[in-house]
Amino acid sequence: MSVKWEKLEGNEGVLTVEVDAEQVNKGLDAAFKKVVKNVSLPGFRKGKVPRVLFEKRFGVEALYQDALDILLPEAYAKAVEEAGIEPVSMPEIDIEQMEKGKSLIFKAKVTVKPEVKLGQYKGLEVEKIDTTVTDEDVENKLKRLQENYAELVVKEEGTVENGDTAVIDFEGFVDGEPFEGGKAENYSLEIGSGTFIPGFEDQLVGMKAGEEKEIQVTFPEEYHAEQLAGKPATFKVKVHEVKAKQLPALDDEFAKDVDEEVETLDELKSKIRTRLEEAKKNEAEAAVRNAVVEKAAANAEIDIPAVMVQNETDRMLREFDQRLQMQGMNLQLYYQFSGQDEAALREQMKEDAEKRVRAALTLEAIAKAENIDVTDEEVNEELEKMAASYNLSVDKLKELIGNLDGVKEDLKWRKTVDFLVEHSTVAA
């Protein structure tokens, strides 16, 4: 097999690959064995048609696509290795020659990982954030806990107020016609949560249980359902019930409900302070680590291919969907409630995706420049920590993980960031 790599403008290039005729014939043989299983001719059972009759009846060309499916993946992988390139996109394959008894010649146009020209990455100056925990911080955390333990109590009298939960029926109309997803019964809506279209919740304020009302709103221009985007709508709403939050008293009993390890409210406050101090310390350390990476990446010269940003955006979108599912939602519901669509969300994520790609490429280049690598011992230590945190044996964890490349890569990036922090100046 012969391989030629031609660099084009930017980060693109073309591999020209020639696979010898002997390998092509092996590919055709394998393709025939696969295809003939479903072929029958007069006098021959399915799968028993001789090769010579098959080619006479259908032509050897009938085997080409299956042969290519067999030959191309291995040939492309070997060509990439031989050329010493790192593709970041799927190849655009162009078959130049495919004939029985001749070599296979194909071109593969790909985008490759860009060259990184490192700038300053040692001696970076970063600021450490204040880790002081104030009494106000403790009180704010206590108030949030109080909110979490609040009970919803039906308001026998009074009207809907901000922060209340209204149990409603609603049906929406655009141009006098109902639309899909615009109707629900006994829906619990927290007023002020921003769950519904802008203006909807505000117009419920002041309503009483049993009251009906027509609400006028306009769908956002970027609303995910194009047929509704930017259009005025009328919602018929009926309030069945109004519930208000009833906060528990901040006393020793509340403290014991929140944390069974404490006996008094003062003990709970002390524990909250300790946790906040630990959280702020971790936050400060993470901020320093992020800052040195961001500065090193900003100092590097990199022509980032659009496909790498797109791939990272895809990954971020999957991560976001997974987080939503853990909260009992999904992307479609998010689009419905937020008024966004996938294109708008992708655009919103694009800047962060590019920063992530730039940071990863920079860290990779620094690790190479400083000969930072990971030993088997370090990998085993990391696996032991992970196994302990999941209450698993190391062998079981390895079985679940399978390929350990991801673990090694994470460790390598962590060591590289450690290096940057050690060689930076952190101002208090």
Curated annotation (Swiss-Prot):
Enzyme class, top EC level, equals: isomerase
Q: Which GO terms describe its molecular function?
A: peptidyl-prolyl cis-trans isomerase activity; protein folding chaperone; ribosome binding
Q: Which InterPro entries match?
A: PPIase_dom_sf, PPIase_FKBP_dom, Trig_fac, Trigger_fac_C, Trigger_fac_C_sf, Trigger_fac_ribosome-bd_bac, Trigger_fac_ribosome-bd_sf, Trigger_fact/SurA_dom_sf
| Record gene name | tig
Does the UniProt entry include the keyword Cytoplasm? yes
Q: Name one GO biological process term.
A: chaperone-mediated protein folding
Function in brief: Involved in protein export. Acts as a chaperone by maintaining the newly synthesized protein in an open conformation. Functions as a peptidyl-prolyl cis-trans isomerase.
Q: Which family does it belong to?
A: Belongs to the FKBP-type PPIase family. Tig subfamily.
Q: Which keywords accompany this UniProt record?
A: Cell cycle, Cell division, Chaperone, Cytoplasm, Isomerase, Rotamase
- Sequence ranges assigned to domain PPIase FKBP-type in this UniProt record: 163-248
Q: Name one Pfam family in it.
A: Trigger_C
The main place the protein resides is cytoplasm
Annotated protein name in UniProt: Trigger factor
One CC-aspect GO term: cytoplasm
Q: Does the keyword Phosphoprotein apply?
A: no
Which NCBIfam families does the entry mention?
tig (TIGR00115)
Domain notes for this protein: Consists of 3 domains; the N-terminus binds the ribosome, the middle domain has PPIase activity, while the C-terminus has intrinsic chaperone activity on its own.
User: Per the record, what are the reactions this protein catalyses?
Assistant: [protein]-peptidylproline (omega=180) = [protein]-peptidylproline (omega=0)
- The Enzyme Commission number assigned here is 5.2.1.8
**Compartment(s) of residence:** Cytoplasm
**Top-rank taxon, per record:** Bacteria
